[in-house]
Regions:
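The conserved acidic donor/metal-binding loop of glycosyltransferases
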Residues: 68-72
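Glycine-rich, basic loop-to-helix element that forms the pyrophosphate-binding segment
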Residues: 43-59
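Active-site donor/metal-binding and catalytic loop motifs
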Residues: 169-184
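Conserved donor NDP-sugar-binding/catalytic core segment of glycosyltransferases
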Residues: 76-107
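Acidic donor-binding loop at a coil-to-helix junction in glycosyltransferase catalytic cores
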Residues: 149-155
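Short, acidic, metal-binding catalytic loop of nucleotide-sugar glycosyltransferases
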Residues: 22-37
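Short aromatic/hydrophobic "clamp" motif used to bind/position activated sugar donors
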Residues: 64
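A recurrent flexible, glycine/aromatic-enriched loop bordering the glycosyltransferase active site
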Residues: 99, 114-134
């Protein structure tokens, strides 16, 4: 079996199976031997933090990134992430679009260049969080609080002290649909 460079981790709810299937179809189309993706479905018995920790524990890649089951990735997502990881960074930056019902999607950028989480001129700037590819050893050190809301922000706050070297990914590679808006 080939060594895995990247583990893509997807906690999912059974009620989102159609959306998750669309996502996994796209992942399967892009998959390489150096990348694994893992799903952890349930019907809401566990908190999202618990599911993220379980997936993290099962991951074997040098790097991990989470993808939310109701979001979507760009057709070149894996290629761009893997190219960024060639430089052996602590993490890779991430640019995406937020589809929140506004006339036009908003841009978000996750990078170690930004301290904290803030918005300016219609762009959301964030320190890396669960959506960014980060070294698995750092993600394992900090883990997620076993809560259902805010676990991503807590993870982001905890992991930032370990992230010193970043590879920049150009272009939009992630499509975020808050509160299940992709299903509507």
């Amino acid at each position: 079996m080939a060594e895995k460079r990247l583990s893509l981790l997807i906690p999912t709810l059974s009620k989102r199976s159609k959306l998750c299937q669309e996502l996994t179809d796209e992942l399967t189309r892009q998959l390489t031997t150096e990348v694994e993706f893992m799903l952890l479905p349930d019907s809401g018995q566990r908190t999202i933090g618990e599911k993220r920790n379980a997936l993290l524990e099962a991951a074997v890649g040098d790097y991990i990134a989470f993808i939310d089951d109701d979001d979507m990735i760009s057709p070149d997502y894996i290629e761009k992430v893997m190219t960024a990881l060639e430089a052996d960074p602590d993490c890779a930056s991430l640019t995406g679009l937020i589809y929140d019902g506004s006339p036009s999607p908003r841009t978000f950028i996750h990078s170690i260049e930004y301290e904290g989480w803030y918005s300016r001129d219609g762009v959301d700037y964030r320190y890396p969080n669960h959506l960014n590819a980060v070294r698995r050893k750092y993600a394992e050190k900090v883990g997620f609080p076993e809560i259902s809301h805010g676990e991503d922000r807590a993870y982001s706050d905890r992991i930032q002290k370990y992230l010193k070297k970043e590879s920049k990914i150009d272009g939009v590679i992630y499509h975020y649909y808050p509160h299940g808006s992709r299903a509507k």
